[in-house]
Swiss-Prot record:
Classification via Pfam families: CtaG_Cox11
Protein name (Swiss-Prot/TrEMBL): Cytochrome c oxidase assembly protein CtaG
One MF annotation (Gene Ontology) recorded for this entry: copper ion binding
Disulfide linkage: none
InterPro entries named among the record's database cross-references: CtaG/Cox11_dom_sf (IPR023471), Cyt_c_oxidase_assmbl_CtaG (IPR007533)
Subcellular location(s) per record: Cell inner membrane
Keywords: Cell inner membrane, Cell membrane, Copper, Membrane, Signal-anchor, Transmembrane, Transmembrane helix
Function: Exerts its effect at some terminal stage of cytochrome c oxidase synthesis, probably by being involved in the insertion of the copper B into subunit I.
NCBIfam families found in the cross-reference section: PRK05089.1
The organism's place on the tree of life at top rank: Bacteria
Gene3D superfamilies: Ctag/Cox11
Native species: Rhizobium etli (strain ATCC 51251 / DSM 11541 / JCM 21823 / NBRC 15573 / CFN 42)
Length: 202
């Protein structure tokens, strides 16, 4: 076979390799974009970055004499007709002390509504040391028309906060919640007996 005949074939193979590399790059970028949000969320939960609090299963074994002022903020996003507020606007626990506070939500609409609370701590440097043992934000909340619900939050401030350079001078932190609407079960059809079938969202 002459060099002239082999050249087009070689060029064709090279072009095919380039196409495959481009396709692999496109699919790879798509996969990275899809995974970016959950990976970022995990990163924030592990590091406390961007004011994300920590979820723990056990209480602190160390309690310091120093206290931390903790204030609370409650918000409701459009689409959810709820009143939502903290029972207490602020508390002053000792650092390392486990404490329970309560929030109250009331459905002012004439239909059952489902909400999911999203939380944040400011200043952001305190997020890694704000440990939640129990919180209504771990699950979705359903409220019937006119229903009023008191919801607890159990937390403590990690004593390590006084050792870190970026957080040792923090004396006040704010825990903020925003409730967002979530879709619940929807009536989709009626059977012959007149009862409503419920479709559960997966």
């Amino acid at each position: 076979m002459s060099d002239k005949a082999a050249a087009p074939r070689k060029q064709g193979r090279n072009n095919g390799a380039v196409v495959m590399m481009c396709l692999s790059f496109v699919f790879g970028m798509g996969a990275m974009s899809y995974a970016a949000v959950p990976l970022y969320r995990i990163f924030c939960q592990v590091t406390g970055y961007n004011g994300t609090t920590q979820r723990v299963e056990q209480m602190s074994s160390v309690v310091l004499d120093r206290k931390m002022r903790v204030t609370f903020d409650a918000n409701v996003a459009p689409g959810l007709q709820w009143n939502f507020k903290p029972v207490e606007r602020e508390v002053n626990p000792k650092i390392g002390e486990t404490i329970q506070v309560n929030f109250v939500a009331e459905n002012k609409s004439n239909e059952t509504q489902r909400g999911q609370a999203v939380f944040n701590v400011t200043p952001g440097e305190a997020g890694a040391y704000f440990n939640k043992v129990q919180c209504f934000c771990f699950t979705e909340t359903d409220l019937k028309p006119g229903e009023k619900l008191e919801m607890p939050v159990v937390f403590y401030i990690d004593p390590e906060i006084v050792k870190a350079v970026e957080s040792k001078d923090i004396h006040t932190v704010t825990l903020s919640y925003t409730f967002y609407p979530k879709e619940g079960p929807k009536p989709v059809a009626s059977n012959e007996g007149g009862t409503v079938k419920i479709e559960k969202k997966l």
